Structure formats: C-alpha cells, structure tokens
C-alpha cells in the first residue's frame, strides 16, 4: 500500500557528488517502511555522463568537471539557475512502473508550464520535455531494489552556454531553452514550488512535509 505522505527536502545549492552519494546511501539503506522523498537542489557547474553515455558526446568540457554516474541516459549539464529534482520513491510499494514514473515526471513539468501558457510536450523516443523542438528539461533515472533515484533537471534562469560543449543527451546540435525566456517561472524557487505541486498530485501523494537539508545519517 502506498504511503500518501511525501517528504520534500530543500537542499539549496550543493556539490553534485555529495548529493549523488547521499541518494545512493538513502536508497541502499531504506526498507519497506522508509518514507518517499523529493530532493530539491541546484548544483555548481558539472557535466554528468550517464550509463549510456559516449565520450565523443563530450566535445569541450574545459574547466567544468565531468562525472561518470549510475543513472540512465547520456551526458547532460547542471549549473546554477537550474532546478534539479530527485524523486527517491519506493515504486515497488506504490506499484508504479518505471515507464509510468517517467511519464508522470514529464507530465508534471508539462502541467506546470501550462500554468504559464507554455505549450510543452514529451517525445516517445527522447526522454525529457520540449518547447518548439528545444529542450527545457532533461530526465535520467536509476531503479535499485524497486526504488528510484536521480531524476529531472529543469532549465529556469541559467547560463545555457555550457550545453554547447556537449551533445546534450547524445543529440548533436540539440538546442536548449529555459523557463525565463519562455515566460515561465523566473526563479528556481518558484519553479520548484510549482513542480512539487504538479508532481505530487500525479504520483498520488496527499500530504507534503517540508524539510531544510538532508536528514542526519
């Protein structure tokens, strides 16, 4: 039976690797009674290379670090002004399939942007969310022990130039776009507050409990 309470952890700006390892630790040590959590964070500039990633898609990283990680998908960029959301959910307990989870995440972004009269959409063959063939949100998950970690990255108000140093998600010439220039949410906080609402509703959570920072381990 699904626990209808979702714990939201607001992490501020944090180093990618420390949050990644904390996600792994939470997933590896959780049990059937552990609460589902949503981590809201921004990262300093970093390229992350997923398990399907190919080195030739990293064109010119320059001084931005490249980290090989254990999520699905290929290379992407994280940086200040981008909303990153990590759903740490027991999908086995809630009986949500992986494809259904991906669809819910994409739809939550589409629904949130629709509040700003932005016509966004998903693509069956290329996970993420798009507006006029430009990508506004990237998606990469990992499922371990029936539980999800990693998640989504929504471009809000950031420097998009580093995306030109890679083939985003393995697609050469893929153009990125962000909420601010589309007339969407203007800050990461605003985007996060709105996305929490749409995502929790789609996933069936009825009570949200907010926390600042990670739980003491």
From Swiss-Prot:
GO terms for biological process: protein modification process. The active site is at residue 169. GO terms for cellular component: cytoplasm. Residues 32-207 form the BPL/LPL catalytic domain. It holds the Pfam family LplA-B_cat. It is found in: Cytoplasm. The record marks 135 as: Lowers pKa of active site Cys. It catalyses: octanoyl-[ACP] + L-lysyl-[protein] = N(6)-octanoyl-L-lysyl-[protein] + holo-[ACP] + H(+). It is an enzyme of class 2 (transferase). The keyword Nucleotide-binding does not apply. Substrate binds at residues 71-78, 138-140, 151-153. Pathway: Protein modification; protein lipoylation via endogenous pathway; protein N(6)-(lipoyl)lysine from octanoyl-[acyl-carrier-protein]: step 1/2. GO terms for molecular function: lipoyl(octanoyl) transferase activity. Belongs to the LipB family. Catalyzes the transfer of endogenously produced octanoic acid from octanoyl-acyl-carrier-protein onto the lipoyl domains of lipoate-dependent enzymes. Lipoyl-ACP can also act as a substrate although octanoyl-ACP is likely to be the physiological substrate. In the reaction, the free carboxyl group of octanoic acid is attached via an amide linkage to the epsilon-amino group of a specific lysine residue of lipoyl domains of lipoate-dependent enzymes. This is Octanoyltransferase. It comes from Shewanella sp. (strain MR-4). The lineage of its organism: Bacteria, Pseudomonadati, Pseudomonadota, Gammaproteobacteria, Alteromonadales. The gene is lipB.
């Amino acid at each position: 039976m699904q626990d209808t309470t979702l714990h939201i952890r607001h992490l501020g700006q944090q180093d990618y690797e420390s949050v990644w390892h904390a996600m792994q630790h939470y997933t590896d040590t959780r049990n059937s009674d552990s609460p589902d959590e949503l981590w809201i964070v921004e990262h300093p500039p970093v390229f992350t290379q997923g398990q399907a990633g190919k080195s030739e898609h990293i064109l010119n990283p320059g001084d931005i670090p490249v980290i090989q990680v254990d999520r699905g998908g290929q290379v992407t960029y994280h940086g200040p002004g981008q909303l990153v959301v990590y759903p740490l959910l027991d999908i086995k307990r809630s009986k949500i399939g992986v494809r259904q989870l991906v669809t819910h995440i994409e739809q939550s972004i589409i629904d949130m942007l629709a509040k700003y009269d932005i016509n966004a959409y998903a693509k069956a063959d290329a996970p993420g969310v798009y507006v006029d063939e430009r990508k506004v949100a990237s998606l990469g998950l990992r499922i371990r022990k029936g539980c999800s970690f990693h998640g989504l990255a929504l471009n809000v108000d950031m420097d998009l130039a580093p995306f030109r140093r890679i083939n985003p998600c393995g697609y050469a010439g893929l153009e990125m776009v962000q909420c601010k220039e589309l007339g969407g949410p203007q800050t990461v906080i605003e985007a996060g507050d709105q996305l929490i609402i749409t995502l929790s509703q789609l996933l069936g959570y009825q009570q949200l409990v907010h926390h600042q920072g990670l739980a003491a381990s």
